[in-house]
Amino acid sequence: MTAARLGALDPTVFELAARRVMARCDELARITSTPGAITRVHLSPEHARVNRLAAEWMREAGLQTRQDAAGNQLGLLPAADPEAPVLMLGSHLDTVVDAGRYDGIVGVLMAIEVVRLLQRRDDDTSGVDAPARSPFDFGLEVAAFSDEEGARFGKALLGSSAVAGTWDDAWWELEDPDGTTLREAALEFGLDPGRVSEAARRPSELVGYLEAHIEQGPELHARGEPLAVVSSIASARRFQLVVEGEARHAGGTPYDMRRDALLGASEAALAVERICSTQHHIIGTVGQFEAFPGAMNIVPGEARFSLDLRGEFDGERDRVWDQISRELDDIMGRRRLRWHTREVHNAPALFCAPLLQDVVGEGIRSTLVPGSAVDGSILGSGRPEDPTTLFSPAGHDGMAIGAITDVGMLFMRNPDGVSHHPDEAVSLGDVALGIRALAEAVAHLGAEHRRT
Ligand code: HGY
Ligand code: MN
Ligand code: MN
């Protein structure tokens, strides 16, 4: 399927595909460990159920499916040459706690629709349905990664790190809030920890990785645009911090005798906000916060909190971490407290490959064709010829996959940028445009690949 032939398709083809994607997002949203909310963490029974459902949808779209040794669900549309490398398209099916229904999920389902649209069935005189094939000199493989969020064990990108061959066996000892180790969870899920390296792919096997994702920020909504090219993905470091003071009687302990761990940690959280909010593309968030022993009439002797620190450039992010650390030394020294920390996640910034940024831009341009309107997302209505390009403060699987191949990303508008929240949304029209843009991007890459 060439870009020209895609362009000849009736826009309703993309709308029908988008309707299927939205309906399936709703169906997957019902697979949750917390009825009434959406929570689907790594190696849970819910993870197994969505992998089975995604595999069914992949097979129905003509793909050959398998679950890899790390629990990722894959669907392959081979090229005519079975030894040819593949372009990987996908996202993740795991969620944060009390999540929205599109973060990750919509990208996996859009990838299935794009591969369905692009596939070719060789004319077969025997009348038997010939197997679907990629029309390019590379195969197309849909990846439904697991554990992009790190919601269960704290370390994110576990599924895509296994594919990238950057797995660290120390992760097997990571524990979830119930004390279950990653190793125990993998065994219970039916995986063999000793074979996780079988999930790893060699650079020579891939021509690249493309991911469609909601923006998880307010930019596109504010600009009134449906789609954007992603230039780079923020680097991330995640820490668990402990502040130690002294538990004392809430009534009998005068203030000058207190070593209140909660107040020390509270000052630290405010310092994170003050330091990060004055820097460009540096984002620090304290998302978890607990005080111990946690009684109303006891001065907290210990406080535990998390820090999620991101930056456009690793060096700047690390400089800010040093600044925060110095500030914590001051705060805890003044309050006669002690603090220590454990880093649980560290992923470098990912700069999207220029070629993949270009083909995603071509894909977006293809949606500018007047008349390719879908449910009111009227196109060609004075939107800039040059597609918007955005930095992604949100993390994505491309941060891991970038270790072995080029990465490109397409953003779709999500109203007000609400994400990691049940109100997360994306419109049918923008998903239809996103499917068209992603398919066109692949077709442009196919043409480019033939030329090289
Ligand atoms: O945390 C993130 O930025 C991503 O949603 N995992
Ligand atoms: Mn997320
Ligand atoms: Mn995501």
Protein language model features and the residues they cover:
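N-terminal capping segment at the start of a domain
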Residues: 2-44, 171, 343
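Active-site-adjacent substrate-binding region
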Residues: 15-18, 29-30, 181-231, 269-274, ...
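Zn-dependent metallopeptidase/amidohydrolase metal-coordination segment
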Residues: 21-24, 29, 87-91, 376, ...
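A non-catalytic alpha/beta surface segment that caps or lines the substrate-entry region
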Residues: 33-78
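A short beta-alpha structural unit
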Residues: 39-43, 285-294, 306-313, 338-358
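Alpha-helical metal-binding/catalytic segments enriched in His/Glu/Asp
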Residues: 89, 98-148, 237-243, 249-275, ...
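Midchain, well-structured core segments that form catalytic/ion-binding scaffolds
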Residues: 135, 147-148, 152-314
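His/Asp/Glu-rich mid-to-C-terminal helical/loop segments that flank catalytic regions of hydrolases
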Residues: 231-233, 249, 253-278, 326, ...
